[in-house]
């Protein structure tokens, strides 16, 4: 198969291929960018594989960065863009179900492609638009099939994260897993416990944010792989509650997706759960806030104080989840409440602790903090203008 017109992303990278070939080596576009070009999907990173060894690649180009040279990858800076050029390679025995014990550089494209995960990702593209397909990846693309390259069990034993990638690709592409590939994913699922939580989180997160997340999640659940993810043993029945969300619903942000997961699981200790997933504190706070907002909305309408206490984006995300559940929503009420706030944080108050100490002789300590909190709430609730004279008069009256 040949692409008559190369997508612009490849055309911009052609000078890199041409320089490598002019130096006497082979070079091809490889991986996800080729797959996405053939599917007419947006292309993100353009990766290049070459028969040139890293030191040879560095001699070809004026500006390079050693980003993963031990694995054969050199970052080439060309035409104000960055391209990863990786030497054709083979990999020895995997010591931890994630990293090969040894990487060997080779001059053969076939040897390089046969180590890849799925046939649709084992395609190469030359400078003329000719697709090199050694594992029937084009047929699988046409038939919307996810099939492991070679023996599926070997691929997943080499790198167990490929199991999560398989579910993620399902969610992204709406493809079906080939029977033997799915069977190997089920058999190798216990190996997921050997993979770093951070890497699993990235794949699971991408799955949840993908357009066909239901398909990927269903495969993750039915395969039993969910049993080997942090704190999710025995969670299948509860996670199936996510399928009750509106059929056309897509999560708008990671924190929203994970809040929905937390709510489906009825997690009581959100911080503890997300700590096991090793998320950032900022992310955990957003997810926890969303769970709290959902609890508030299940009991009453939101108030000005709620709009002050929680980020407007999170309030709207929580409302989106309610809408997906078929519950009553009022987006305009939230926006109106937010717009009516006199202040959105305590830094916007006309007074601070230092001013009160100077004006009224307050000492640092709990009492001063209590007064500031009372002022903050009075201003937010609309009981007190955010005006210096009014605030001072309010304090005088309370003294």
UniProtKB/Swiss-Prot annotation:
Question: Which residues take part in binding Mg(2+)?
Answer: 45, 47
Full protein name = CCA-adding enzyme
Q: Which Gene3D superfamilies match?
A: 1.10.110.30, 1.10.246.80, 1.20.58.560, Beta Polymerase, domain 2
The UniProt record gives the binding positions of ATP as 32, 35, 116, 159, 162, 165, 168
Tell me one GO biological process term. Answer: RNA repair
Residues binding CTP are 32, 35, 116, 159, 162, 165, 168
* EC number(s) stated in the UniProt entry for this protein: 2.7.7.72
Q: What does this protein do?
A: Catalyzes the addition and repair of the essential 3'-terminal CCA sequence in tRNAs without using a nucleic acid template. Adds these three nucleotides in the order of C, C, and A to the tRNA nucleotide-73, using CTP and ATP as substrates and producing inorganic pyrophosphate. tRNA 3'-terminal CCA addition is required both for tRNA processing and repair. Also involved in tRNA surveillance by mediating tandem CCA addition to generate a CCACCA at the 3' terminus of unstable tRNAs. While stable tRNAs receive only 3'-terminal CCA, unstable tRNAs are marked with CCACCA and rapidly degraded.
Record-level Gene Ontology MF annotations: ATP binding; CCA tRNA nucleotidyltransferase activity; magnesium ion binding; tRNA binding
Similarity remark: Belongs to the tRNA nucleotidyltransferase/poly(A) polymerase family. Bacterial CCA-adding enzyme type 3 subfamily.
Cofactor (UniProt):
Mg(2+)
- The reaction(s) this protein catalyses: a tRNA precursor + 2 CTP + ATP = a tRNA with a 3' CCA end + 3 diphosphate; a tRNA with a 3' CCA end + 2 CTP + ATP = a tRNA with a 3' CCACCA end + 3 diphosphate
Q: What is the lineage of its organism?
A: Bacteria, Bacillati, Bacillota, Bacilli, Lactobacillales
The reply to whether Kinase figures as a keyword in the UniProt entry is no
Q: What else is known?
A: A single active site specifically recognizes both ATP and CTP and is responsible for their addition.
PANTHER family cross-referenced by the UniProt entry = CCA TRNA NUCLEOTIDYLTRANSFERASE 1, MITOCHONDRIAL (PTHR46173:SF1)
Would you say which domain of life the source belongs to? Bacteria
Keywords (alphabetical) are:
ATP-binding, Magnesium, Metal-binding, Nucleotide-binding, Nucleotidyltransferase, RNA repair, RNA-binding, Transferase, tRNA processing
Q: HAMAP family of this UniProt entry?
A: CCA_bact_type3
Cross-referenced InterPro entries, in alphabetical order?
A: Bact_CCA-adding_enz_type3_sf, CCA-adding_enz_C, CCA-adding_enz_firmicutes, NT_sf, PolA_pol_head_dom, PolyA_RNA-bd
Subunit and partners: Homodimer.
């Amino acid at each position: 198969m040949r692409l008559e017109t190369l997508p612009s992303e490849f055309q911009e990278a052609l000078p890199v291929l041409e320089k490598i070939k002019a130096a006497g080596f082979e070079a091809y576009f490889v991986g996800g960018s080729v797959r996405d070009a053939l599917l007419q999907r947006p292309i993100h990173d353009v990766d290049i594989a070459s028969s040139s060894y890293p030191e040879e690649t560095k001699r070809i180009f004026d500006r390079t960065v050693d980003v993963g040279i031990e694995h054969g990858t050199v970052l080439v800076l060309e035409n104000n863009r960055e391209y990863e050029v990786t030497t054709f390679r083979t990999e020895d025995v995997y010591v931890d179900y994630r990293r090969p014990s040894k990487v060997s550089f080779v001059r053969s494209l076939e040897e390089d492609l046969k180590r890849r995960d799925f046939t649709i990702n084992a395609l190469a593209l030359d400078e003329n638009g000719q697709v090199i397909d050694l594992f029937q990846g084009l047929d699988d693309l046409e038939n919307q099939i996810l099939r492991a390259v070679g023996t599926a069990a070997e691929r997943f034993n080499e790198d167990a994260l490929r199991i999560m990638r398989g579910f993620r690709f399902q969610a992204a592409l709406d493809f079906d897993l080939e029977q033997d590939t799915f069977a190997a994913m089920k058999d190798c699922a216990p190996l997921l416990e050997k993979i770093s939580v951070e890497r699993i989180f990235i794949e699971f997160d991408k799955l949840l944010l993908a357009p066909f997340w239901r398909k990927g999640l269903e495969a993750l659940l039915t395969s039993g792989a969910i049993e080997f993810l942090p704190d999710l043993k025995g969670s299948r029945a509860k996670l199936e509650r996510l399928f009750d969300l509106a059929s056309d619903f897509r999560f708008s942000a990671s924190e929203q997706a994970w809040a929905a997961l937390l709510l489906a699981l009825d997690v009581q200790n959100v911080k503890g759960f997300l700590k096991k997933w090793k998320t950032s504190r900022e992310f955990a706070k957003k997810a926890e806030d969303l769970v709290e907002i959902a609890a508030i909305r299940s009991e009453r309408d939101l108030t000005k104080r709620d709009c002050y206490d929680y980020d407007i984006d999170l309030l709207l995300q929580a409302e989106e989840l309610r809408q997906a559940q078929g519950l009553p929503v009022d987006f305009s009420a939230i926006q109106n409440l937010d717009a009516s706030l006199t202040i959105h944080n305590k830094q916007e108050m006309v007074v601070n602790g230092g001013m009160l100490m100077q004006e009224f002789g307050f000492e640092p300590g709990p009492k001063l903090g209590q007064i500031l909190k009372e002022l903050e709430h009075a201003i937010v609730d609309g009981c007190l203008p955010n005006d210096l004279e009014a605030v001072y008069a309010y304090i005088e009256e309370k003294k």
